[in-house]
Amino acid sequence: MRFSPILSLYISRHFIMAFLGALGVIMGLIFLFDVIELMRRTATHAEIPFSAILEMALFKLPNMVQLILPFAVMIGAMAAFWTMTRSRELVVTRSVGVSAWEILAPVLVVVLLIGVVNVTAFDPLSATLYKRYERLQDDMMLRGSASPLQVGENGLWLRETHGEQQVVVHANAVRQEGFDLRLREVSVYVSDANEHFLYGVEAALGQLDKGFFHLTDVFILRPGHPVESAPSYDFQTQLTLAKVQDNFASPETISFWELPSFINFFESSGFSANRQKLFFQSLLSSPLLLMAMVLVAAVFSLKPNLRSGGIMIRVVGGVVSGFLFYFFSKVVYALGLSATLPVVMAAWTPPVVTGLVGLAALFHLEDG
């Protein structure tokens, strides 16, 4: 296979322009629909200015870009190849002995670079902005009340209301063992409705079980009273193990570079990090998925003889194929989340299968 630098740059430029155009149009539509949806959700909050709605839509946009990036690549590749085919540029190029693989090579290299930049540079930016978007949602009360529970490397923090009392619970270390949640260095602070401190409980160990914190090696602190010690102390709570697991930070808000440490933390604490591991592997496989989408686009747009007809059928076929592969990837992803499939298999199967199907179709069209 021969490579012409001039031809490669020319094809790459055509693809980049078509890709940016497709990405820009899709981003504009997503931004418009997000603004409309946020306006609907804030209709009962007259105090929220329109500038805040625009800010939220902008913070969410990078995360949506990552979701639609494969479609933008496929549409951009189809548009670039169709433009060059209609202008007879590809016809002339193919007539002098340039194969489809030589035409695709520069596009695949560009897409690989786009995928690497997306994972290593754009994803951290997207995670930071999406985290700010979720905080704005909580501040503006657009998704119910903010979560009273936080679990992370700083331990567990919980805020609950018991009648007219406010309760804050903190544990420096938390670990899941089977169906039990075990805590170390537990502090409980109880205040009244006016946030006046009533009493506190310090415990060396704790366990969450059936709506109660069972604390051991306890010291009870009351204002104006000496410190009391007790072998155990039971404290009622609304917290469950399922709520703790559901409260883990969504992987979309964690940078690609920080995901491994988060995964190690959760696994060392005995929790399942399946969701984070699957998201991390999906990021690693995303450049391959983008390249596979180029192959799918080429199957429906590299045919040089436009007089053979069926142009609209091939365009529709390309779009439908893209959505079918997307649906397939979501089904496999769901199987990975449920631990039906291994994480690596669930993350890498869709791009590998898509790429192999594209390669097989191109081999058939190119070499018969």
Q: What do the PLM-derived regions correspond to, one by one?
A:
Residues 1-60, 189:
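Hydrophobic alpha-helical transmembrane segments
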Residues 10, 14-18, 102-115:
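Start (N-cap) of specific transmembrane helices in multi-pass transporter permeases
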Residues 25, 61-80:
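Long, hydrophobic alpha-helical segments
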Residues 50, 111-224:
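Non-transmembrane, extracytosolic/lumenal segments of membrane-associated proteins
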Residues 77-91, 96:
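Transmembrane helix boundary and interhelical loop/hinge segments in multi-pass membrane proteins
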Residues 94-99, 339:
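Short helix-to-coil transition segments within interhelical loops
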Residues 241-270:
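Extended, hydrophilic extramembrane loops/domains of integral membrane proteins
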Residues 271-364:
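Transmembrane alpha-helical segments that form the functional core of multipass membrane systems
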